[in-house]
């Protein structure tokens, strides 16, 4: 996972940033913290070691798309085939959500909570407030 992330940074993210473009990723280091540390119990020290070793550029801004767990699970089921994370129980997602909450408290200048219970258009409008 981290070798692919390092390659993605070097071949996609950094060239785009150097060209003056804005880069949006659907998952990155904060998702790794929420899912692997908060959700699965990986130690933060191990994750930090991986980030220090493989991640040459940390995000300037993270949007945390927060919605009630049951709503998120219903949306995933409505899309069809569930991936391995989407097959987890609600208790796992409560831990992940708590992880994102902890990140937003630890880095309030960078991690922004968006109310994802709203329509996609409303969520997009929330995100635009930070640009």
Language model segments and positions:
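Conserved phosphate-donor/acceptor-positioning beta-strand/loop module used by diverse small-molecule
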Residues: 25-27, 48, 55-77
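Short, conserved catalytic or interaction motifs in soluble domains
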Residues: 35, 67, 116
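NTP-dependent small-molecule kinase module
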Residues: 70-131
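ATP-dependent small-molecule kinase phosphotransfer cores
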Residues: 1-55
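Short capping/connector residues at structural and topological boundaries
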Residues: 38-40, 59, 90, 97-98
């Amino acid at each position: 996972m981290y070798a692919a992330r390092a390659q993605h940074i070097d071949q996609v993210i950094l060239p785009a940033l150097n060209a003056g473009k804005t880069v949006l990723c659907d998952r990155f280091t904060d998702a790794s913290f929420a899912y692997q540390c908060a959700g699965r119990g990986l130690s933060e020290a191990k994750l930090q070691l991986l980030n220090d070793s493989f991640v040459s550029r940390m995000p300037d801004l993270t949007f945390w798309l927060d919605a009630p767990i049951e709503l998120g699970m219903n949306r995933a089921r409505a899309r069809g085939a569930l991936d391995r994370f989407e097959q987890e129980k609600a208790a796992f997602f409560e831990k992940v959500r708590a992880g994102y909450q902890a990140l937003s408290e630890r880095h309030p200048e960078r991690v922004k909570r968006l109310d994802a219970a709203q329509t996609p258009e409303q969520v997009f409008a929330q995100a635009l407030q930070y640009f």
